[in-house]
């Protein structure tokens, strides 16, 4: 599920896939994006696509609806 984190702007990384013979081919490390409903300051709800790490942080801060 490629894309960007709507909270921090984090995006996928690129790197190399290494075979047993140490041949290299380009690959991407995609983000683990999850849909999270967040309570805004004015009391409304908004759905964001954030990484699993940021979803845990939002839940810890009590901002998840």
Curated annotation (Swiss-Prot):
Keyword Ribonucleoprotein part of the UniProt annotation: yes
UniProt keyword Ribonucleoprotein present: yes
Coiled-coil spans in chain: none
Disordered: region residues: 1-21
One Pfam short name: Ribosomal_L28
Superkingdom classification of source: Bacteria
Keywords annotated in UniProt: Ribonucleoprotein, Ribosomal protein
GO cellular component, as recorded: ribonucleoprotein complex; ribosome
Gene Ontology terms for molecular function: structural constituent of ribosome
Any one Gene Ontology BP term: translation
Family in the record: Belongs to the bacterial ribosomal protein bL28 family.
NCBIfam families linked: L28
Name of this chain's protein: Large ribosomal subunit protein bL28
Native source species: Metamycoplasma arthritidis (strain 158L3-1)
Lineage of the species this protein comes from: Bacteria, Bacillati, Mycoplasmatota, Mycoplasmoidales, Metamycoplasmataceae
């Amino acid at each position: 599920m490629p894309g960007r984190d709507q909270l921090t702007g984090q995006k996928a990384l690129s790197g190399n896939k290494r075979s047993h013979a140490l041949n290299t081919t380009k690959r991407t490390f995609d983000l683990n994006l999850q849909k999270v409903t967040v309570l805004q300051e004015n009391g409304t709800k908004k759905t964001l696509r954030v990484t699993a790490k940021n979803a845990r942080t939002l839940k810890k801060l009590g901002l998840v609806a």
